[in-house]
């Protein structure tokens, strides 16, 4: 931990189980979500945010509200809103968004994430058409499509991704499409077979953290499986760039991050994002360190030395943040 990140001011409130009756169909967030996972969230001193952590408040310009109105009119969800992304004001203000398909209830309960958990609703058969119309209406040149985990579906939602990609290309043939997919655990080969029908322009799947912290941060996921997903997709689609992202601040070391980056390159991952983890609430995993800008710069330099075609590295970087610029600099658009 750097000296500038060591200013502890208060102790985070420990999570205690909610007294609300459990309803599997309701969307659980914050304490209602994290109190029921088999991972103990250990209270930690709340660190003072350093000067380099600056989040722009959501601005009320016309483009911001235009996007929100169009999304609601088409019954669409963005991960920007559901995950409480700190960059939502900037991105919506510039007319960009990351669309989240297959509902707003995830079958996983990752304690770093603010997306709600619950028994998902049936897939909306009109969503691919509504999504494609929205993208065309907004005249977007580059879009990111992501989703909740859908462990309840036999293909993990792969066919729904393909339907969204193909319909978007039909209405907006010049638009480049990046997908940020779940891990399709237990159905990987089936999902890859389906994605082969209509592959995206960029294939993204986040490793999120170092393998030592997977049990704590990504219950239900597997580090080796996530690497295999990207490597196997690349083997089938050698001309489609692959991408993955990491958070820092969960208790990892710099060397562990570098080791994950080496693993990424050994599994033919082309593009990289690294950003600072910011806890959505006191009921999520605590921030254990704020990484200094000099360290982010070191990660970026090492990334290019390792052969990544593009590395977006910095405190406020998120997987989809300025994804169009990342793709452009990597030669995709």
From Swiss-Prot:
Its EC number is 2.8.1.8. Binds 2 [4Fe-4S] clusters per subunit. One cluster is coordinated with 3 cysteines and an exchangeable S-adenosyl-L-methionine. Keywords: 4Fe-4S, Cytoplasm, Iron, Iron-sulfur, Metal-binding, S-adenosyl-L-methionine, Transferase. [4Fe-4S] cluster 1 binds at residues 80, 85, 91, 320. Residues 1-29 are annotated as: Disordered. GO terms for molecular function: 4 iron, 4 sulfur cluster binding; lipoate synthase activity; metal ion binding. It is an enzyme of class 2 (transferase). It is found in: Cytoplasm. It catalyses: [[Fe-S] cluster scaffold protein carrying a second [4Fe-4S](2+) cluster] + N(6)-octanoyl-L-lysyl-[protein] + 2 oxidized [2Fe-2S]-[ferredoxin] + 2 S-adenosyl-L-methionine + 4 H(+) = [[Fe-S] cluster scaffold protein] + N(6)-[(R)-dihydrolipoyl]-L-lysyl-[protein] + 4 Fe(3+) + 2 hydrogen sulfide + 2 5'-deoxyadenosine + 2 L-methionine + 2 reduced [2Fe-2S]-[ferredoxin]. Pfam families: Radical_SAM. InterPro entries: Aldolase_TIM, Elp3/MiaA/NifB-like_rSAM, Lipoyl_synth, rSAM. One of its GO terms (cellular component) is cytoplasm. CDD domains: Radical_SAM (cd01335). Coiled coil: none annotated. Its main location: cytoplasm. Its cofactor is [4Fe-4S] cluster. Residues 91-309 form the Radical SAM core domain. Pathway: Protein modification; protein lipoylation via endogenous pathway; protein N(6)-(lipoyl)lysine from octanoyl-[acyl-carrier-protein]: step 2/2. [4Fe-4S] cluster 2 binds at residues 106, 110, 113. Belongs to the radical SAM superfamily. Lipoyl synthase family. This is Lipoyl synthase. It comes from Ralstonia pickettii (strain 12J).
